[in-house]
Amino acid sequence: MKKAIFYLLACVLLPVAASADEGMWLVSTFRDVIYPQMKKEGLKLKPGEIYNEESPALCNAIVAVDGGMGTGSVISDKGLVITNHHVAYGDIHSLSTPAKNYLEEGFWALEQKDELPLKGKTVTFLRQVRDVTDEAQAIRDSLEKANSLGIFGTRKVYGILERKYGGDTPFEVECASMWKGKKYLLFYYETYKDVRLVGAPPVKIGAFGGEQDNWGWP
């Protein structure tokens, strides 16, 4: 785990106009799948400016909060992360007291000494995606021939690959199958544990309008 400080800013994010095109794509594969349509719709960025494992790109600004329970965006070179209010709701609630009701009144750290540590909070970056489909299918075939696949066969395949590739990297390695087993991918993650609350509006503002749109759209 990296020892760096990340500052969480919980905000209400307003909806914006969106195209009717639907679907979700892996960021590592968007170049061939959806980029031509994105460019046609007016996108000015080059593929390498959106996803790049070797150089700075837009993907480096996107984080998973608490292992994927929420998402956020890095908006400064000091590690400031902005996220939805509901992602930090439980943390704000746990930090609140009758004397300092941050949930109802909001909170802003005007100086670094005012930041509030969020115990157990994590932010995670995706650093690399590796296609291991051929190797995974070979492992699966071998397990089937040995009659040792069992009902947890897919998890066995994941475990073999995670152990093989996870030992020589500082990142966390997680295997997953996509498109009903047609693709097997390894995801390399970098997780930071020193996360601190620096700002949150009062709950009446942060949670205004409820969560209907949030759970209805990706």
Feature annotation, model-predicted:
Residues 4-14:
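Sec-dependent N-terminal signal peptides
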